[in-house]
Amino acid sequence: MNSDDIRTVVFEILRRIAPESDPSALDPNENIRQALDIDSFDALNFFVRVNEQFGISVPESDYGGLNTVSEIVGYLSARLG
């Protein structure tokens, strides 16, 4: 899975978490929690869905460093190899 495929899946997950938003319009370096008004419960749901969709387990200790689309896609690209 390449970075574009990962980004597409991340956008789909974000659309489910924040259905009134358009994640694809985000600046890749913009904080998604602030831009999409995602609270801590929604953020947790996002990572649960990421784990399910990609078949990996993102440790909770990594959540705080994954705030932008670029950070999330880079992290997942590295984890998925």
List each model region and its residues.
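Phosphopantetheine-dependent thiolation modules in NRPS/PKS and related acyl-activating systems
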Residues: N2-I38, E52-Q53, S57-G81
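Conserved alpha-helical interface elements of two-component signaling phosphotransfer modules
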Residues: F41
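Acidic, metal-associated active-site segment
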Residues: L44-N51
